[in-house]
């Protein structure tokens, strides 16, 4: 359902707070998902197995999630700002066979290493037997010893265009409760339910149509990331931002909306409150493309 569209137009756009940008077309997204799903099969990953992802909000994260969904593998992700214990508390419960991660990410002007945490995670989760790593910046070559290079795996894999049908309620991903009352609790979502609910919310509630542009500021550890990915099923393009929402300047997200002519813009209530408290005025930006702003996470 998400990969049904074929086009040389962009399906996903990505911007880092560092200024680094990437895009992927619908056609290339389809090919990468099919190649990664083929690789998963070589590892004997099967329907119902779990893949854990400790990843920034990048295109590779979505490719990985969709490859899992294609094979009936259950996805679960944490954002890299989670500490080792936070990751272990979540992933240890689901006994993943593979961990997907990146070499680093950026936040508030700092380049933060992710790989230095991975060995500690592996010590606590013995079910993980392979780690797949993608480079945050394609201009920077990975230097890996015991882990697999994401791009090399894709380049060497066959194009598997077989799509197996699964039960309507077959699990597509595992999310988690906040962990404020004990350890985070697993919340499993069924694929059919998610697809129908997200299509309803995008197309009926938000009036989103094929070819429009969706941007929600989120991390891979928040349910709004999963929601945003669901927007691809409408034929809309989605846009990702990785980093602090007000770095390198207070209106970096709004400027992104202007430059990409975003139609749906989603943020947390805290972000809107921050703009209000700073008395920010967007009069120097052209935000006329935005037809709906959504907010969640706390009362506005």
Regions found by a protein language model. Name each.
Residues 2-25, 135-142:
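AMP-dependent adenylate-forming
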Residues 8-10, 132-133, 145-176, 183, ...:
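Conserved pre-ATP/AMP-binding loop-to-beta segment of ANL
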Residues 12-66, 83-88, 146-152, 189-192:
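Conserved AMP-binding/adenylate-forming core of the ANL superfamily
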Residues 50, 56-84, 94-99, 212-213, ...:
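A short helix-loop-beta submotif of the ANL/AMP-binding
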Residues 51, 68, 171, 177-180, ...:
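Conserved S/T- and glycine-rich ATP-binding loop of Class I adenylate-forming
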Residues 56-58, 218-222:
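AMP-binding (ANL) adenylation modules
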Residues 84, 91-101, 105-144, 234, ...:
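Conserved adenylate-forming
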Residues 195-213, 221-263, 278-280:
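Conserved AMP-binding/adenylation subdomain of ANL enzymes
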